[in-house]
């Protein structure tokens, strides 16, 4: 039995809490929303009807983190810098379940956290895992990226179950970037579907988008093969093809003629791909990376006409297929 502190009582936070609860671990969730905290303490899952908690509690007191070794962070990426500086991370296992790039400074979560507390042990939990399906105990496979294999094996044992398979990977950068960048490509796929461009176009954007993700990853020392695993191709396929995906839905609404503001209002939840696209645009320009899909999503988010930008998504500039 492990004791795990969890920041973020959104869908992802409650989903993993549900899974950990089934495995008999004690979980304490942190959130600022008192109504959500109250529901959890009454044993009620705040987002999935019919699911009850046994060993999960919640608090609005962030200082209670000091009692726990294992910290899972499932906060929206842009919120993390404000929260993480308020806690003592010394001696912690920090497991990031958030997917994105910090817009203000273009940093990955691992970079931010390690700057605050260099000696903590950092992990990334990522892969194709829609919250509702995990909460219901449906079969899922994800990856845990690590810098300390001994601790990673302990966490793998704590998380793994018959219907929740956890693989290990020592490429933290690749797993982090895969989880973040696939949201941008999913917006592009949704846009294409919203404009009615068919399955050929969808398949092309997913495939070429994966190539762009791997190109960005390699620039930062990630292994290319990581992007063809669960945190890359696996998560990209799921997020790009299911209407449960907020990023795909956002893109689809843009393709149907909604403005950025209208689409975000209609979804009424965090769409991580929007801020990630803005951060990613700065990165691909700075590093001179050929990434027309990622660049196109940024241009559309900034107000350009999707019908004029879309043709550039698959513009090959007469390149070889696997040219970097």
UniProtKB/Swiss-Prot annotation:
One GO BP annotation of this record: glycerophospholipid metabolic process
Pfam families noted in UniProt: NAD_Gly3P_dh_C (PF07479), NAD_Gly3P_dh_N (PF01210)
Domain of life, per lineage: Bacteria
Free-text function comment from the UniProt entry: Catalyzes the reduction of the glycolytic intermediate dihydroxyacetone phosphate (DHAP) to sn-glycerol 3-phosphate (G3P), the key precursor for phospholipid synthesis.
NCBIfam families for the chain: PRK00094.1-2, PRK00094.1-4
Chain's gene name: gpsA
Keywords: Cytoplasm, Lipid biosynthesis, Lipid metabolism, NAD, NADP, Nucleotide-binding, Oxidoreductase, Phospholipid biosynthesis, Phospholipid metabolism
Subcellular location: Cytoplasm
Pathway as given in its UniProt record: Membrane lipid metabolism; glycerophospholipid metabolism
Annotated residues for binding of NADPH: 99, 131, 246, 272
Entry annotated with the keyword Signal: no
Enzyme Commission number(s): 1.1.1.94
One CC-aspect GO term: cytosol
Keyword Glycosyltransferase: no
Enzyme class: oxidoreductase
Main location: cytoplasm
Sequence similarity: Belongs to the NAD-dependent glycerol-3-phosphate dehydrogenase family.
Protein name stated in the entry: Glycerol-3-phosphate dehydrogenase [NAD(P)+]
């Amino acid at each position: 039995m492990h004791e795990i502190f969890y920041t973020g009582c959104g869908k992802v936070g409650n989903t993993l809490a549900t899974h950990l609860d089934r495995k008999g671990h004690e979980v304490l969730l942190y959130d600022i929303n008192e109504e959500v905290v109250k529901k959890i303490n009454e044993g009620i899952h705040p987002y999935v009807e019919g699911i009850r908690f046994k060993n999960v509690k919640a608090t609005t007191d962030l200082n209670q983190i000091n009692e726990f070794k294992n910290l899972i962070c499932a906060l929206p990426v842009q919120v993390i810098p404000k929260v993480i500086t308020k806690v003592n991370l010394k001696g912690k296992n920090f497991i990031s379940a958030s997917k994105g790039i910090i817009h203000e400074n273009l940093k990955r979560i691992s970079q931010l956290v390690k700057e605050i507390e260099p000696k903590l042990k950092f992990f990334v939990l990522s892969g194709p895992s829609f919250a509702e399906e995990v909460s219901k105990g449906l079969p899922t496979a994800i990856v845990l990226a690590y810098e300390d294999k001994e601790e990673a094996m302990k966490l793998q044992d704590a998380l793994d179950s018959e219907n929740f398979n956890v693989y290990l990977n020592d490429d933290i950068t690749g797993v982090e970037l895969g989880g973040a960048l696939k949201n941008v490509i999913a917006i592009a796929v949704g846009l294409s579907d919203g404009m009615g461009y068919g399955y050929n176009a969808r398949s092309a954007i997913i495939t070429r988008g994966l190539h762009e993700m791997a190109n960005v990853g390699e620039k930062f020392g990630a292994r290319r093969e990581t992007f063809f695993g669960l945190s890359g191709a696996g998560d990209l396929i799921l997020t790009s093809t299911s209407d449960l995906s907020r990023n795909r839905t956002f893109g689809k609404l843009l393709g149907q003629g909604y403005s950025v503001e209208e689409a975000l209002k209609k979804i009424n939840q965090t769409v991580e791909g929007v801020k990630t696209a803005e951060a990613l645009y700065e990165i691909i320009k700075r590093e001179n990376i050929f990434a027309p899909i990622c660049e196109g999503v940024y241009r559309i988010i900034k107000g350009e006409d999707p019908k004029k930008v879309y043709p550039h998504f698959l513009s090959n500039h007469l390149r070889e297929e696997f040219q970097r």
